[in-house]
């Protein structure tokens, strides 16, 4: 199992993160694979940069509104950053409805 520090310290991730950060002003013109944007959100979460984690999660939800992975991350953010159990339940219900 790769630890988070190693996962975020490789050339490919650094390139993806640099692309994301460089495009902050115009994200609509950029495309990211769901795994890449999820890694970006996880990276900011790992670094305790909640504001940027929220932005990355919102961007992921914009690109992939029905992705279970994105909905899980939204639920985690709602629960652990917002302390909003009702919002977390809402995302969990959306995931459940897909299955």
Regions from the language model: what does each represent?
Residues 32, 45, 79-80, 96:
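Hydrophobic/aromatic side-chain positions at a characteristic register within alpha-helices
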Residues 65, 97-99:
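Short coil turns that delineate tetratricopeptide repeat
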Residues 42-43, 47, 60, 77-78:
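Residue-level signature for tetratricopeptide repeat
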Residues 48-54, 80-92:
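Structural signature of tandem alpha-helical TPR/SEL1-like repeats
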Residues 2-11, 21-34, 93:
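TPR-adjacent "capping" and linker segments in tetratricopeptide-repeat scaffold/adaptor proteins
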Residues 39-40, 74:
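Structural register within alpha-helical repeat arrays
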Residues 60, 94-95:
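Canonical positions in the second alpha-helix
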